[in-house]
Amino acid sequence: MGDDYTPYYARRGDVIELEQPAKFGPKTSLVEMPISWSLDDFPVFEYLRQQNVLQAGLMNAGLVLENWFDDFAYMRDHYDWGVRTYTFHPHVIGRGHRLVMLDRLIQKLREAGATFVMMEQAVAEYRIKFPNGRSERGR
C-alpha cells in the first residue's frame, strides 16, 4: 500500500518511533505491487460484525464497478505506465450479481485500453522501465 499505481522496491529495517519522523531503511530487491483496500472485494461486499467492529459491506455492485473503473481511468489519464491490482476472493466475488459486475468491469477495462498481465510480467516490465526503482507521476 505504498503507492496507488506503481510497483516499488520494498525496504527493510525501517524504524518507526512514537512522535518521531520515520527512518526508512535500505531498499531491497523485492518488488511490491500496488494494492489498496479500496480495490479489494471483501471490505465493500462482506458484512462483518464483531464486538467492537462493524464492517457494513453489502455495497451496490454497480457503484463499486464505477469506483474500480474510475481508479483505472485516473491512472490511464495521469500516468505514463502503471498497475492496478484488484483483489478478489472466490467466496465474495462469486455471487451472481457480483460476477455480472466483474464481467462488466473486465469489458470496460478492455474497451478503455487496459492490458491484463500476470504479476510476474508486471514486475519484469517495472524493473526494465525503472531500473533504479524510481517511478514518477507521468503526464
Which positions does each model-derived feature cover?
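Active-site-adjacent pocket scaffolds in enzyme catalytic domains
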Residues: 1-80, 130-138
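C-terminal domain-boundary segment and adjacent tail
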Residues: 55-139
